[in-house]
């Protein structure tokens, strides 16, 4: 895969798919600028070469055409602050204003196009729409790993209209780090899987059983495993239709010599509430009417030990309902163990979504090896699927 380091952008207009799908508050201020911040080095390389940048992205999920709350103009102030130069805006992505402003762009200038998803054609992967986008630039750059698993017009289809195309620094780093874990993991290798549902993680767990030495299961999905083993899990979250599958995964882990670590105990609550009454209980005997909302102290101890003795760590999904203070300890302690292992030379990849949010919230983003920006894209990559956005750059 070619990266932007292989290209000189002098006098060229780069059409760049970025991921500016960032959260906004009620006054339309960006509340988390990580995705914008991540792509700044890509933009700087192109501008320093003497090129210009045309940025395209989606924001949110607009239903019926343009909606002000989903306008990318709300990201301009943040982008200008981080980039240290003015950013022009086109109130469309394929209309007359976009075409004129792109054509008049001088070296060193930046133009941001309006939200791609204001057009239904974007998510449909419409070829004519992609061709119109392609007319705006000379070279195509994709720096949006978070949407690489979608064959949309701007992430995949548009690439066919360019002789020169390349991955930006974010895209290249994402693919390199995922490859490192998938193909060249130093042993012992532990995968930590959390989150609510087994159904979201079946494929990745099956793939990882061929790669890892240890598999840690936490979060809501662990109760489906305990119920499958005949335990009493009270009214903890259980996917009744996945009990056989959970048993099957336990057997597969055994057959492949993978040590499967389920949480021994839980912090249980009498209701799903930040102010609920809580106790610690063994996971095989949770009281009727109570539910497990975090891993317990014994589980923390076992998990931490496994993590701290590992050389490669992949973490995807929290250990409990970490948005609520009473149920955040498990996720926090696992994060601390990952940081400790990393400081001793382990390679740690944090897989997007909630795990990335938890690591950021704890101030640990710089203390792990890599935090992925792509939740769904990373999962699909580890499931062994081809990512259309990555394939389009080859």
Where do the PLM segments sit?
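Active-site loop-to-helix "anion-binding N-cap" substructures in soluble metabolic enzymes
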Residues: 1-394
